[in-house]
Amino acid sequence: MSKKENNTCNTCMSDLTRRDFLKVSGAITGGLAAASAVSNTALASSGGGDIPLEDQKALFYDATYCVGCRECELACKEDNHLKEENVDDLSGNTFTLIKLYQSEDGGESSFRKYQCMHCVDPACATSCPVGALEKTDEGPVLYESLKCIGCRYCMQACPYGVPAYDWSQAYPLIAKCDLCYDRHDGPACATACSPGALISGTRGELLKIAKERIAANPGKYYEDRVFGEHDGGGTSVLILSAVSFDKIGLPPLTEKAIPHYGETATRAVPYIFGGAAGFTAIVYRATMTAEERQRLGKKQGKEEGETE
């Protein structure tokens, strides 16, 4: 455990009152049992509620149109007020990332946009013991930080390796793309994409566009199919590529919905926490009010400032 993690846990436990301790102690037994018995179907909405799948919000990425300009990355950071950083993977300040695949002989290459795939039946939501991740009726998979207990089951459950832990915060939480859920003009990345590699719309509309491109260009696209139409039960982010999907970082999935990926994570309870002591701190954090979290965060920030 890092020094920062130790400081966080120590501060949490030192602020416990007798009433808090009894509250936490009482929650441990029930919490361990409840988390271990999370249903694989109770927490995730598999069909997007009352809105038909074809009418839900989606994003289409055609890798053959992408020139690697990274306008999408910049737009995402600006719209979400994220810090600039030079990273090679998704993080608490990077929700989308353009990477380049190139074969060893240099004869084959392709760009690939990494981000949350917004699964039709998301394993991350199914694996979350407190319902901090939810598949909305409109399509995007959203994250509610106030519910999060920092267990990181979603990170284990996601077959795309998307959820990132934001260690820069006083309370490390999960961070990921929300498909610009509340943005009227659609995802910022798609709006900024001048080459036309990104298009936003309904899932039905985008599938039609993708299939029209396949039909108009026989042999151009890998397997003449759209990744995400059926893979892992389907996703709200649809992808076309000229090279095999595994070469651009997409996992080989069947058409079966993927919540079963969350089974491994939920079975790991409570060992991920390092035993009951670690779980105590996690449960305490989960039972804190927003005001308590803010107060402790300010205290921690002050202490860190004094040590610098």
What do the predicted segments below correspond to?
Residues 15, 36-70, 286-308:
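C-terminal segment of N-terminal export signals and the immediately downstream linker at the start
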Residues 29-35:
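Bacterial N-terminal signal peptides
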Residues 41-42, 46-49, 67, 71-90, ...:
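Iron-sulfur cluster-binding cysteine motifs and their immediate structural context
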Residues 94-103:
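Interfacial juxtamembrane loops and adjacent helix segments
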Residues 104-110, 114-131:
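Long, hydrophobic/aromatic-enriched structural stretches that serve as scaffold segments
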Residues 114, 174-175:
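Short, solvent-exposed interaction modules
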Residues 200-297:
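Long, compositionally biased charged/polar accessory segments in the mid-to-C-terminal portions
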